[in-house]
Amino acid sequence: MAKLIVSDVDVKDKKVLVRVDFNVPIKDGVIGDDNRIVAALPTIKYIIENGGKAILLSHLGRIKSDEDKKSLSLAPVAKRLGELLEKPVTFVPSNEGKEVEDAINNMKDGDVVVLENTRFQDIDNDFGKRESKNDPKLGEYWASLGDVFVNDAFGTAHRSHASNVGIATAMKAAGKPAAAGFLLEKEIKFLGNAVANPVHPFVTILGGAKVSDKIGVITNLIPKADHIIIGGGMAYTFLKAQGHNIGKSLVEDDKVEFAKELLEKAGDKLVLPIDNVAATEFNNDAASEVVGQDIPDNEMGLDIGPKTIELFKKTLEGAKTVVWNGPMGVFEMPNFAKGTLEVGRALADLPDATTIVGGGDSTAAAKQLGIAPKLTHISTGGGASLEYLEGKELPGIACVSDK
């Protein structure tokens, strides 16, 4: 069922509550990466350019004590948003009470207000984690502040919080619209369609350290994908399951039997490394060598080897849909980043393919290579992307009204 989108709703003269994902890295009041703020701009601009009042809610980090509040205020984010919008943005240093209500009542059409970090509600109250545990009264209170709710935070779509599910539930109960923003719409369109209705050949590239993080994804995609490429630390659990010696490589021994089952179920769909770059220690400057699928006892695999790079490139040839999540090696160490970077290049060079990238290291690789403009979509969600690829219904999407 298609979801209601912000562009389906009349926002003129309306107070529009928008759950954005402004969970950006901040150190000493300085924002390290403003990508998530930039990603929210199309929805915010649409609302204010069409005569609506934009009231923005977001979490930032995890609040465990009063001490955390100092470093996790959204004040620097509101300032940066004002610079990006090239207009004044009002920051309210609370998210409940008279100060909030007065600020909203004083808004004119086209104004933007940013409320304080929603997770400040996770301490100092009788309920406990009011935001993270979805206190219905908090959701109802926030819903009472607006006429329309827009969820544009894919990064928290796999969580049922007061600021997404709570507000949407209360809005719909009051007969008010709960819509998806343009960013959420994009994730549904590309990531959702890649899983539900991919154009074939459909190839998934999975990497990262742990098989356990990707078990649900592999299980869900075996019937759907034409090939599943496995790289990164998780590959060694599969190589061990095949009977190879993996030396000191990262392995999840409790997942070896499960890896055997997946190998049996997937047949030749699973594409594993055929050679590896190995070293005696986990260190960028460690002396390394290219070895086959068997790794010497005193060494550990830290990247895919040159033959594997060629194999993975060949597997990608002719693909029409590709989803990539996770690095092929220890990407943060330059000497073991080649596999990840080469796979990224191959992805960018695919003609007529829908290419979707998710996960921090894969996204960082795409940016480092300058290939982001050549990719169809870079997902803004970490855990949310994985759960979507697992075929799970995400609460933050389910709570949005259907068209």
From Swiss-Prot:
Catalyses which reaction(s): (2R)-3-phosphoglycerate + ATP = (2R)-3-phospho-glyceroyl phosphate + ADP
Keyword hit for Transferase: yes
Binding of substrate, residues: D21, F22, N23, R36, H59, L60, G61, R62, R119, R159
Domain of life: Bacteria
Pathway participation: Carbohydrate degradation; glycolysis; pyruvate from D-glyceraldehyde 3-phosphate: step 2/5
Chief place where the protein resides: cytoplasm
Cross-referenced PROSITE patterns: PGLYCERATE_KINASE (PS00111)
Subcellular localization, as worded in the UniProt entry: Cytoplasm
An example molecular function term from Gene Ontology annotations: ATP binding
UniProt-listed Enzyme Commission number(s): 2.7.2.3
One annotated GO biological process: gluconeogenesis
UniProt keyword annotation of Membrane present: no
UniProt keyword terms in alphabetical order: ATP-binding, Cytoplasm, Glycolysis, Kinase, Nucleotide-binding, Transferase
CDD domains: Phosphoglycerate_kinase
InterPro entries, per database record: Phosphoglycerate_kinase, Phosphoglycerate_kinase_CS, Phosphoglycerate_kinase_N, Phosphoglycerate_kinase_sf
Main EC class the enzyme belongs to: transferase
Subunit relationships: Monomer.
Name this polypeptide is given: Phosphoglycerate kinase
